[in-house]
Amino acid sequence: MIEIKINTDALQNGLNNIAQRTSNTRPLMTQLARIMRNAVLDNFEAGGRPAWAPRKYPSAREGSGLLQDSGRLRNSITPSSTATEAVVGTNVEYAAIHHFGGQTAPHTILPKNGKALKFGGRFAKRVNHSGSKIPARPFMVLQPDDEQALVDAVNDYLDAALGN
C-alpha cells in the first residue's frame, strides 16, 4: 500500500492568521452604516432616485423638497452598527407610509388653535376626513453606485487585513 501524507500546518496557520486579521469587523460595519446613511440622504437631496411622485398640489409648499417640509424625517435617518451588522433606520412614525405609500385612515380634524376650522370659505367645528392616498416615495433604497461603494469598502477592509 502506498501512503501519501501532506503536511497542512502552513495552510492551517495561514487560515488562522486570516481569521485573526478579519475578526474585528466593527470598524467595517460602522463604515458600511455611514455609506448607507449617505445614500439615503442623497435620495432626499435628489428628490428620489428615481424621482418621487410630485406633490398633488405643487404650489402648496413651494421651496421645500419632497418629504422635507420640516426636515424631521430626513434628520431622523440614523446609522447603527455592531460587529456583525450595519443598519440605517428612522424612528419617525410616518416614515413607513411615505416609503411604501398607502391610504391613511379616516379621521376627524379638529381645530388646534381657536374654535373653528375654515375650509373653502366655510367654518366648521370639525371635519370628517375620508383619509388620503399617499404615493410611495421610497427613500430607504440603495442605488447601484451605493452598492458598489459598499463592495469597495469591504474589499478595502479585506485588502488591509490581508496586507495587500
Predicted features and spans:
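Short, Lys/Arg-rich flexible segments
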Residues: 1-99, 103-164
